[in-house]
UniProtKB/Swiss-Prot annotation:
Pathway: Metabolic intermediate biosynthesis; chorismate biosynthesis; chorismate from D-erythrose 4-phosphate and phosphoenolpyruvate: step 4/7. Homodimer. NADP(+) binds at E83, G132, A133, G134, G135, A136, L230, G253. Involved in the biosynthesis of the chorismate, which leads to the biosynthesis of aromatic amino acids. Catalyzes the reversible NADPH linked reduction of 3-dehydroshikimate (DHSA) to yield shikimate (SA). GO terms for cellular component: cytosol. Belongs to the shikimate dehydrogenase family. It comes from the Bacteria. GO terms for biological process: amino acid biosynthetic process; aromatic amino acid family biosynthetic process; chorismate biosynthetic process; shikimate metabolic process. Keywords: Amino-acid biosynthesis, Aromatic amino acid biosynthesis, NADP, Oxidoreductase. One of its GO terms (molecular function) is NADP binding. It catalyses: shikimate + NADP(+) = 3-dehydroshikimate + NADPH + H(+). It comes from Salinibacter ruber (strain DSM 13855 / M31). This is Shikimate dehydrogenase (NADP(+)). Its EC number is 1.1.1.25.
Amino acid sequence: MPLDATTQLVTLLGHPVEHSLSPRIHNTAFRAQDVNAAYVATPVRPEALGDAVAGLRALQFLGANVTTPHKEAVLPVLDEVTERARAVGAVNTIVRDGGRLHGDNTDIAGFLRPLEERGGDALEGAPMLVFGAGGAARAVVYGLLSHYRPERLTIVARRPDQAEGLAADLAAHDPDGALRVSSFEEAALSVRTSRLVVNATPLGMAPDRRGQTPWPNPVDFTADHVVYDLVYTPEETRLLREAAAEGATPIGGLDMLVEQAAAAYRQWTDRGMPQAAVYDALRAD
């Protein structure tokens, strides 16, 4: 659909944004459904974030996505924030409703949906483990605590203080006392005895970290494991390849990427995203 005077705009606020796949995802969806909207990525330095958000309101943008380094800093400049976004302390989606801007975090739903589609109910109450303690891990840990009530949820990080901070921040959402913290050096038993293992670190991401893995001991995986890597480039990481060779069920990060985008797309357009067209576009290269 050609752009015209009624085209609605959506943008990505971040710095840098050149690597983002979000414009490809959403513009593919808009075209597939003849939605008169366009998605652009906008580099915004931290000191300009307030002005950028004010611009969304003044220019009547349909909404926006928010990425590094603004996911936390954007909360106080929005009119309303969902409970889940406030719980994890991060917003990745903004929706304009009249003159008000609402913030949400669709990373949580985006992470959970691929698990649910692969029989995730069997993970209810199971022991789990997450590699990483950054922003991605925060959404993952909150989602697992709220949806699966794991018997044990171990956060494995190279910086124990960061993992301890994450556990403390989410303690209010851990009524069963499931959260544990471990170093990589002490995590072997937790890896072996967890039903779900999630990589929420950049290890394995192309180009700079391709071939790296958070867990170089694949013999610790079995057919009882579900191994979920949030890395989406390449689509099959070393972690997933090695875990699958041991019989584990692999889930790649491309599914989460599309699902979190679909959750935002629905809020902006009140439509389901045409995911088959989006996957085709992402895999075209």
